[in-house]
């Protein structure tokens, strides 16, 4: 089991699928991190502008705004926020775009929880 540090890291999670949002929140909560979860990209960005999260985990396929668009807006309003992209489809072109735009990691939904937590921890460790 991956153990995440107990240091305070502000994590924002954005996914339009409430079941994924809930499961991912629980997973991060289970290792001691608090997550602010959002289903709406605009609300996510409003809060990010004032709270400047350390880490954002963003779904790519959403109805109102793609995760890539959210990532672009987030870079402008909170340039220090590290981004992890999460998606249901593994599209190499989208993966390249996300990584070229500064994503620290890219995961496919359904990834084994230990692998996901290790990626989140590595990203969080790179903040300091």
Residue ranges of each PLM-predicted region?
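Acidic catalytic/metal-coordinating carboxylates
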Residues: 39-40, 66-69
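Receiver (REC) domain active-site loop signature in two-component systems and cognate sites
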Residues: 62
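Alpha4 helix (beta4-alpha4-beta5 surface) of REC/receiver domains from two-component response regulators
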Residues: 69, 90-106, 111
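Conserved phosphotransfer cores of two-component systems
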Residues: 48-51, 73-81, 101
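Acidic, metal-coordinating helix/loop segments flanking the phosphotransfer/catalytic sites
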Residues: 37-55
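Non-catalytic signal-transmission and effector/linker regions of two-component phosphorelay proteins
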Residues: 1-12, 18-19, 114-128
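Active-site residues of response regulator receiver
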Residues: 59, 87
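Two-component/phosphorelay signaling modules centered on CheY-like receiver
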Residues: 18-36
